[in-house]
Regions:
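HotDog/MaoC-like acyl-thioester-processing domains
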Residues: 3, 7, 11-12, 68-69, ...
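A conserved, well-ordered hydrophobic junction motif at loop->secondary-structure transitions
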Residues: 22-35
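A short small-residue
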Residues: 15-21
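Residue-level recognition of specific faces of alpha-helices
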Residues: 14, 33, 57-60
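Hydrophobic beta-strand-centered segment that forms part of the acyl-chain substrate-binding groove
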Residues: 6-8, 28, 39-76, 80-81, ...
Length: 158
């Protein structure tokens, strides 16, 4: 399987925040953002694997700033690291004020997807071809998140 660069899976989604996705204060619902984050991450994972993917984990999702009705919500996703049958994606969410064009980072999430066949069997994923120092740092951070996630899974809960 040939390695693929992160640029092969880079994904950008844009849509207008409408009232049906907002709370009474006129800001997009956190659940609506989470739904879009999952879709953007899955598209990036699918582009990298060229297979079906399922969401296995959301390691981190931060809401830094609200997005108001009428603004654009922009989601940028990319694969950060690959493992045997899974991969991590990073999804950055931005708001864009439609009249001024001002953009602001509003959320960031890290999701793990597993590549599967139509009958749910795991598939090996192509390695990620990291070419820049920034990509190496992002990949190293993803490996740390994975180790932490696996430790949490192995710890019995009360």
């Amino acid at each position: 399987m040939s390695p693929k660069p992160p640029s092969d899976s880079a994904t950008e989604m844009v849509q207008v925040v409408l009232p049906n996705d907002a709370n009474p204060l006129g800001f997009i619902l956190g659940g609506s953002v989470m739904h879009l984050v999952d879709i953007a991450g899955a598209i990036a994972a699918h582009r990298h694997t060229r297979s079906l993917v399922v969401t296995a984990a959301v390691d981190e999702l931060q809401f830094l700033h609200p997005i108001k009705v009428g603004d654009l919500i922009i989601l940028k996703a990319r694969v950060t690291c690959t493992f045997q049958t899974s991969l991590e994606t990073q999804v950055d969410v931005y708001s864009e004020e439609t009249l001024t064009g001002e953009k602001k980072l509003t959320s960031r999430a890290f999701l793990t997807f597993v590549a599967v066949t139509e009958d749910g069997q795991r598939l090996r994923v192509p390695p990620l071809l990291v070419e820049t120092e920034e990509e190496r740092q992002v990949q190293a951070a993803a490996r740390v998140r994975r180790e932490e996630r696996l430790k949490r899974r192995a710890t019995p809960r009360a």
